[in-house]
């Protein structure tokens, strides 16, 4: 039996009447959750050891029940996004040899052949997740149980108010929300989720339960929470992952929730947690202090000690489906970074790097400076082709202010090289986002090039 099943069973036995799951219209105690899991597992008797099972119910509570029910049958849950098209689901099922699908409590057998049907499954896999993105087929990856149990322990160290409730209003198909849910149920806490993020109804629900609460969000959600201007004394910890929050956002959060600790995480679906920034105590523009026992390498460093970040820890995944990792292998994050006094500084994604006149330009470094300007909501630097320089940088931004190019150029030149200063500025109404709530860089770039912004 998986340890997460043992942990869950412990709290079912100890606290059967404690709330386990809260999703708007559905509330389940630990005892009720246990019965639902058992009944579901009886429906899925045909699932055999290590067979992959796609979870695609429209209601997240059903997917959580089925997640544990599949484990009781010895299968491997595959976390689908309920908004995916039938065509995408068919492609994923065929590509990754997903033998079964569950929707509306019905188990359906898949008859398609796959190139991975003879693959050796890594040890202690608890599910298969999928990378998010706006283009191409999501990549399937193995998440092993030990990596999350280690992550749970690191989380516990950072929660300082004996939080009894864990909130993650994002889709369970995203690693952050699913992680928060399994973490809550493995530690006897109440998990609150939402089918669709609604900050006002979320605040009302947290206030009604009136328990010490930790909330897992992405920066776009943080901004929406700020916009509600609703105080909630129950919120004791805010854990944000996906992008660095600005000083202005931190100050607004501190004003709205003075009792709460703000903990920013940097990590990836593959590597899990890499660094953390507790109440912005790390140096400006750093993404925080490296977690204990996270080893790092900077590959192909330049003269400024900037290199491609690779990490190794007990929290990393077990590889992509078809490309399983060797235990203890290094995970390349795709980020250019440097490290100073155990604090990690990101300068940009490898895929986002712009080469202006032969000089490497990293968008993240420019964006962080722009985000420090009062009145700026979001900033994005993209590279577009240029006959003379190869590429030039373009700044897209949203907010209440109208930036003046000469003033911005003067401001940036004090801290950046000439090649790093964007050649053009464009104010836009809003950004486009990926499924996980991050700015969709490629889509924004294409729309700018095509004159659609």
UniProtKB/Swiss-Prot annotation:
GO terms for biological process: fatty acid metabolic process. Belongs to the ATP-dependent AMP-binding enzyme family. It holds the Pfam family AMP-binding. It comes from the Bacteria. The gene is vraA. InterPro entries: AMP-bd_C_sf, AMP-binding_CS, AMP-dep_synth/lig_dom, ANL_N_sf. PROSITE patterns: AMP_BINDING. This is Putative long chain fatty acid-CoA ligase VraA. Gene3D superfamilies: 3.30.300.30, N-terminal domain of ligase-like (3.40.50.12780). Keywords: Fatty acid metabolism, Ligase, Lipid metabolism. It comes from Staphylococcus epidermidis (strain ATCC 35984 / DSM 28319 / BCRC 17069 / CCUG 31568 / BM 3577 / RP62A). One of its GO terms (molecular function) is medium-chain fatty acid-CoA ligase activity.
């Amino acid at each position: 039996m998986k340890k997460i099943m043992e942990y869950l069973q412990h709290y079912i036995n100890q606290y059967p009447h404690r709330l386990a799951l809260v999703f708007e219209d559905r509330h389940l105690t630990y005892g009720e959750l246990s019965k639902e899991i058992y009944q579901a597992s009886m429906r899925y008797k045909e699932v055999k050891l290590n067979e992959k099972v796609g979870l695609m119910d429209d209601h997240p509570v059903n997917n959580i029940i089925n997640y544990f029910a599949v484990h009781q049958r010895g299968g491997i849950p595959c976390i689908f996004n309920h908004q995916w098209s039938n065509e995408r689901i068919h492609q994923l099922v065929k590509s990754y040899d997903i033998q079964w699908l569950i929707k509306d409590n019905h188990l359906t057998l898949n008859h398609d052949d796959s190139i991975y049907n003879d693959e050796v499954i890594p040890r202690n896999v608890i599910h298969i997740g999928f990378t998010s993105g706006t283009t191409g087929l999501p990549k399937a990856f193995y998440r092993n149980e030990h990596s999350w149990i280690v992550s749970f322990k690191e989380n516990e160290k950072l929660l300082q108010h004996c939080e009894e409730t864990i909130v993650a209003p994002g889709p369970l198909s995203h690693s952050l929300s699913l992680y928060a849910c399994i973490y809550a149920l493995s530690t006897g806490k109440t998990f609150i989720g939402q089918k669709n993020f609604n900050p006002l109804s979320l605040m009302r629900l947290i206030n009604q339960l009136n328990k010490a609460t930790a909330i897992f969000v992405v920066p776009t959600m943080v901004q929406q929470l700020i916009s509600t201007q609703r105080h909630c004394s129950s919120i004791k910890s805010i854990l944000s992952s996906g992008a660095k929050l600005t000083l202005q956002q931190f100050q607004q959060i501190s004003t709205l929730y003075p009792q709460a600790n703000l903990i920013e995480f940097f990590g990836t679906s593959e590597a899990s947690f890499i660094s953390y920034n507790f109440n912005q105590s790390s140096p400006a523009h750093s993404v925080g202090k490296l977690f204990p026992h996270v080893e790092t390498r900077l590959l192909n460093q330049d003269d400024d000690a900037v290199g491609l970040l690779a990490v190794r820890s007990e929290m990393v995944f077990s590889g992509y489906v078809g490309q399983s990792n060797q235990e203890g292998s290094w995970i390349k994050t795709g980020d250019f970074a440097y490290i100073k006094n155990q604090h990690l500084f990101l300068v940009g994604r490898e895929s986002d790097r712009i080469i202006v006149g032969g000089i490497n330009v990293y968008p993240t470094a420019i964006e962080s400076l722009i985000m420090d300007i009062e009145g700026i909501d979001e900033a994005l630097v993209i590279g577009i082709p240029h006959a003379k320089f190869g590429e030039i940088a373009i700044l897209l931004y949203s907010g209440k202010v109208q930036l003046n190019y000469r003033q911005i150029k003067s401001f940036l030149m004090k801290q950046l090289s000439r090649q790093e200063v964007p050649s053009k500025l464009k104010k836009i109404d809003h950004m486009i986002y990926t499924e996980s709530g991050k700015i969709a860089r490629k889509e924004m770039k294409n729309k700018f090039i095509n004159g659609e912004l």
